[in-house]
Amino acid sequence: MIIDGIEYKLIPGLMDYYVSKQGLVYSARRDRILKGHPDRKGYLNIYPMIGHNKKKTMRVHRAVALAWIPNPDNKPEVHHKDEDKTNNSVDNLAWVLLKKM
């Protein structure tokens, strides 16, 4: 899907939610880009609807990785290469075995 010249992919496991390589999240249900909200650890979260009145918390960096970064070894964590938790660009993310501290 292309919106304003930016390519988006469906976030696996979420209907009607798409994410760009830059970390922008689009809700087809609401027809708008969602704003990420920082949690107490500094990660940006979105709150997609997964049912009639149910919301799910999802970190934006995980949505980017699920949609854009292959994970053939089924690694569980997504790491920010530059340690900036708000830089959710696909080029800044990597699947890892354990979260690097």
Where do the language-model regions lie?
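Conserved recognition-core residues within compact binding domains
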Residues: 1-78, 82-101
